[in-house]
């Protein structure tokens, strides 16, 4: 009987004690959102939504359970250091701790892209090409002088040498985007560029992506930008003609945050660029949605070039 009471006390204590400790000392622990999504909020309590409350509260509790980040960090450490796992959630850990983002879900399956298991059929390529052409025509009909469609390569495309042995590339031949780029070149009059081959020429001399992030660094952004400028104006300032400096502060990233090693992985550096386009100054006006998400940036400069450039894209456009 006494043994049962002790077990009951230990069980109840294991449920209650973490919450009590957390309530008093949560400020001393890591409580940042380390996931690439918005965490669930505490659900509203009312008669209309009472039936949904248990499920919504469970989602909230899972996202805000006490010591979550520290527990995740510990589990990830065990996975990588003892069991030598190279994939934690959507993040693949490569050579020299290079991190890659390879989710496997509908609409965002970078893993299938890397493994070359999702190559477009001719019918799919034709449908997508037709959609791009319609967008191009819509802009041209409204006075736009030039329309160009660029596709930036994924990090694992340029830096596959740092990928681990698993996951293995399954498909033979071109990837989905390589196949589609060839289709566009042979069957469409849209100005289209998949930038993998262009950027690959620079990877031996320069690091173009942040080691622990999904995005390009300043070097990758500059080289890509000058490619666009060259296409649009016929002029550019090659990166070889400017001063490149290595920063001194750690360049951390979203991927190291996602696996709970944001502070530990600190050997990467951002690059500074000097002596380019001297005398050019610009101002930036930002517009945000009601939720605080940035939806528009307007740049104005003192450049003699009076042309207007509009860039529509994902987070890579900010580099």
Give the location of each predicted region.
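Extracellular glycan-modifying ectodomains
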Residues: 1-319
């Amino acid at each position: 009987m006494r043994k049962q009471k002790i077990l009951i006390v230990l069980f109840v204590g294991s449920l209650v004690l973490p919450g009590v400790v957390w309530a008093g000392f949560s400020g001393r622990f890591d409580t940042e959102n380390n996931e690439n999504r918005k965490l669930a909020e505490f659900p509203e309590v009312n008669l209309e939504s009472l039936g949904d409350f248990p499920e919504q509260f469970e989602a909230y509790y899972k996202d805000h359970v006490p010591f979550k980040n520290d527990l995740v960090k510990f589990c990830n450490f065990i996975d990588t250091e003892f069991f030598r796992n190279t994939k934690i959630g959507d993040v693949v850990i490569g050579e020299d701790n290079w991190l890659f983002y390879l989710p496997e879900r509908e609409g965002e399956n970078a893993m299938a892209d890397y493994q070359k298991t999702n190559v477009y059929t001719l019918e799919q390529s034709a449908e997508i090409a037709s959609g791009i052409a319609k967008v191009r025509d819509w802009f041209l009909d409204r006075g736009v002088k030039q329309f160009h469609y660029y596709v930036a390569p994924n990090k694992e495309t340029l830096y596959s040498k740092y990928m681990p042995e698993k996951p293995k590339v399954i498909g033979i031949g071109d990837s989905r985007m390589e196949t589609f780029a060839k289709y566009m070149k042979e069957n469409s009059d849209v100005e289209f560029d998949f930038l993998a081959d262009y950027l690959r020429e620079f990877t031996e001399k320069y690091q173009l992506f942040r080691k622990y992030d999904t995005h390009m660094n300043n070097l990758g952004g500059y080289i890509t930008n000058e490619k666009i400028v060259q296409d649009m104006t016929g002029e550019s300032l090659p990166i070889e003609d400017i001063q490149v400096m290595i920063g001194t502060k750690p360049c951390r990233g979203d991927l190291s945050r996602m696996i709970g090693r944001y502070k530990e992985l600190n050997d990467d550096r951002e690059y500074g660029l000097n002596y380019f386009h001297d005398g050019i100054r610009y101002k930036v006006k930002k517009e945000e949605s009601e939720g605080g998400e940035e939806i528009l940036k307007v740049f104005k400069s003192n450049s003699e070039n009076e042309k207007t450039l509009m860039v529509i894209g994902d987070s890579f456009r900010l580099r």
